[in-house]
Amino acid sequence: MKRFCVILLLALSSLTTSYAQSVIIGEKLPDMNLRKYLMDFQPEQTPYTCYLFYHSKSELCKRSLTAIKPLIKDANAQLGLVIITKEEYEDAGVTLTEHLDDYISVAFDLQGRAFRSVNVNFIPFCIICDHKRRVLWCGNAATLTQNVLDKILTTK
């Protein structure tokens, strides 16, 4: 009876599997239609771009941003960061203004198109892609290390 219950539980859990993001390493990132940037400050063109899906009230998002900022600065203009939020300027703009620089920008996704285009179901979520928009890495930016980033930036 116990074996039957375990098999039944496994079968039911496989039917209700929740899907995370639909981003696949090596495939092209869908167009996210980012149009509205904080202070109209669009990111500099860089060989690699990191997209960080963000919410200003989330402590995990704040930690993720804090962890990735030094990596962006150490990338020597090879990697730009676009912070994407579904929040209004009044909610997120003020707190995110301090993070703006030549290689860090904030995009407002008020209708959630960017979140939907890559099926973001949890935040913080981060995607690194090359200039052809080919996905090279995805996950929580807080787990990205300098060694992993170096491999991403040096692999052709």
Please provide the spans of the model-predicted regions.
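Bacterial N-terminal signal peptides
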Residues: 5-14
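N-terminal "domain-start" segment that seeds a small globular fold
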Residues: 18-42
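Short active-site neighborhood of thiol/selenol oxidoreductases, capturing the structured segment around
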Residues: 41-64
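Structural microenvironment flanking redox-active thiols in thiol-disulfide oxidoreductases
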Residues: 62-99
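Short hydrophobic alpha-helix segments
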Residues: 64, 118, 137-139
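Short, internal strand/loop/helix patches
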Residues: 98-127
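Thiol-/selenol-based redox modules, centered on thioredoxin-like
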Residues: 129-156
